[in-house]
Amino acid sequence: MERLWGLFQRAQQLSPRSSQTVYQRVEGPRKGHLEEEEEDGEEGAETLAHFCPMELRGPEPLGSRPRQPNLIPWAAAGRRAAPYLVLTALLIFTGAFLLGYVAFRGSCQACGDSVLVVSEDVNYEPDLDFHQGRLYWSDLQAMFLQFLGEGRLEDTIRQTSLRERVAGSAGMAALTQDIRAALSRQKLDHVWTDTHYVGLQFPDPAHPNTLHWVDEAGKVGEQLPLEDPDVYCPYSAIGNVTGELVYAHYGRPEDLQDLRARGVDPVGRLLLVRVGVISFAQKVTNAQDFGAQGVLIYPEPADFSQDPPKPSLSSQQAVYGHVHLGTGDPYTPGFPSFNQTQFPPVASSGLPSIPAQPISADIASRLLRKLKGPVAPQEWQGSLLGSPYHLGPGPRLRLVVNNHRTSTPINNIFGCIEGRSEPDHYVVIGAQRDAWGPGAAKSAVGTAILLELVRTFSSMVSNGFRPRRSLLFISWDGGDFGSVGSTEWLEGYLSVLHLKAVVYVSLDNAVLGDDKFHAKTSPLLTSLIESVLKQVDSPNHSGQTLYEQVVFTNPSWDAEVIRPLPMDSSAYSFTAFVGVPAVEFSFMEDDQAYPFLHTKEDTYENLHKVLQGRLPAVAQAVAQLAGQLLIRLSHDRLLPLDFGRYGDVVLRHIGNLNEFSGDLKARGLTLQWVYSARGDYIRAAEKLRQEIYSSEERDERLTRMYNVRIMRVEFYFLSQYVSPADSPFRHIFMGRGDHTLGALLDHLRLLRSNSSGTPGATSSTGFQESRFRRQLALLTWTLQGAANALSGDVWNIDNNF
């Protein structure tokens, strides 16, 4: 110890003056950070007086004060106290290190949450100058609400609904120019348009679609009037069919199975089905699968609100809807429809081979009166007749469909606010612009909200807000033909978007009522939606947030709110095709369908009457929801996506598989590997959480690495074992095809209905063991691949699969 003390004294004698590290506050672009610099001697004294959070001093250097006459007593005392001095210095150093670490970590804890970067500062002052200092979550929220309140949502909805905007029309071309000019006026970083040349189907004015009675001798008789020749089903098969009429409820598979079980076979017949529950495309596909000749689709008055003060759909009005079971241009499946692109001579497998035509309630009433046969089940009954509905069969009908295909240019409009730290990661929000009729609820509301959000965020940027990630605002064309504009864009940039798009928010069908709120979304966004619902006031329950309104009727908020993404949503392709989490939220009318959707009666006036004057408040609530989602997704340091949520999704689906464990065991099959893959995913998600929690928050390289892993979770659930050209919707939970969990479950159910009932049966219509083994293997390896990818680098993967 004496020798150590001597060396320490000699080192001090060799140091001519003291040197210490000073941390000083930095102004300008790095304001709020600490900067390290070396200060020597007296030059550092003034700085230390200004800001020195911690100062460690050893013994004073020799020569720094007048020499003492006698150092021997001091040296002797020093030798006796040396162990204590060293121990004290070590304790001070350790304490200072821990204090400094905590202080450094704490300086970024304004967020109050390990996955939040926008601070939850509850002490916000309303008249804060946004140009001064750091913007906390409450600052951004107040800024957003301040600028959003200055908009003219209702007037934009009214004006947009008055304009003709069928895809490819002159009116749509004029609206496209106006909206692009509106984006340009907001001084965004980038504004541009892309054009696609797509195949759209329209009625032939010279040869309208027709419906006739046919007598027993096969002679065509009286024509049934189709009141509006403009109402049709895009992508219906062309031609004419004749068959007996059968009533098939909503045209779901279970409806058709029930029909067959009651002795009425759909094969070779025309089906009369009701609007609603599933899409037109699904109705026609199901009818085709059950051998029907054609489909007539009508709006059943019993399915809509019977509240006298509210308007109802005219009994002479038919409902428009495309019948392509897919999205995008069905004549270029899997390929973008840019000009001069060469396409293979193949059409989408989702195009039907049977014709379909919408009819009004009045025509349906005439048809239902002619039906004989068994009485329909009670839940199939409607309000068109004074007597019960029958299943049929009824008289023969002849349906003629003469729609024609036209190559049509469509235009998507883009506006971008570039991000500050991660400009190559995009938070995307879009709304359909086109409409077959007035389209007030269908697309005018979404277009108005999109334009208002562009204006609001542009104003926020002018007042100091700079998002971490880029915001991409898009106005889609061709939406009424099956999200054609959005899907073609995704197909054109597929190799880029799954790496760069963080989330997609859809504003389509946002206001269809004001009683119920539904969010059709990916599981990754469920927790974020819950958080944002707590920040937005209910438009029709004063003093309550939307979250409080929801849990008042059902404590299980997600069971009340969350729904799967439907194929007829523009958000569907983002998730099922590209692997980007997406959400589309809607206010509904007390679980009753909005009666005017996809009709010529979807006007501003009818929408206003249905909402009884609350349209501005509900549209404002949607804008607040969307805007606060955008702030969180574009500004948070760590993406607020709940990557662990898919573990619960897998568990729920495994519960459905367990029902068949006994049947599988009898055939020597097991679900063990599915359980193992889920376990690996859960462990990988928890490991990532722990890594994030224990990491240095100011390390931008680590932050970006974590964000990349988080934002690609949805992509991990796209099956890598099927071709995007053959099976574009590769998502194993939300997609369509033999690779999905739904297809595997449907196949398993054949075990119970397999006529042979013996292991190894290979009936083409029954359970096929070889096919099931392949389905199970591909599904399991997709799950395992997701777990491995979430684990990070290959040397971090720890499983015994």
UniProtKB/Swiss-Prot annotation:
It is found in: Cell membrane. GO terms for cellular component: cytoplasmic vesicle; external side of plasma membrane; HFE-transferrin receptor complex; plasma membrane. Gene3D superfamilies: 3.50.30.30, Transferrin receptor-like, dimerisation domain, Zn peptidases. A motif (Endocytosis signal) lies at residues 23-26. Mediates cellular uptake of transferrin-bound iron in a non-iron dependent manner. May be involved in iron metabolism, hepatocyte function and erythrocyte differentiation. It is linked to Hemochromatosis 3: A disorder of iron metabolism characterized by iron overload. Excess iron is deposited in a variety of organs leading to their failure, and resulting in serious illnesses including cirrhosis, hepatomas, diabetes, cardiomyopathy, arthritis, and hypogonadotropic hypogonadism. Severe effects of the disease usually do not appear until after decades of progressive iron loading. This is Transferrin receptor protein 2. Homodimer. Residues 35-45 have a biased composition (Acidic residues). It comes from Homo sapiens (Human). GO terms for molecular function: co-receptor binding; transferrin receptor activity. Residues 16-45 are annotated as: Disordered. The keyword Iron-sulfur does not apply. Glycans are attached at residues 240, 339, 540, 754. Predominantly expressed in liver. While the alpha form is also expressed in spleen, lung, muscle, prostate and peripheral blood mononuclear cells, the beta form is expressed in all tissues tested, albeit weakly. Keywords: Cell membrane, Cytoplasm, Disease variant, Disulfide bond, Glycoprotein, Membrane, Receptor, Signal-anchor, Transmembrane, Transmembrane helix. One of its GO terms (biological process) is positive regulation of transcription by RNA polymerase II.
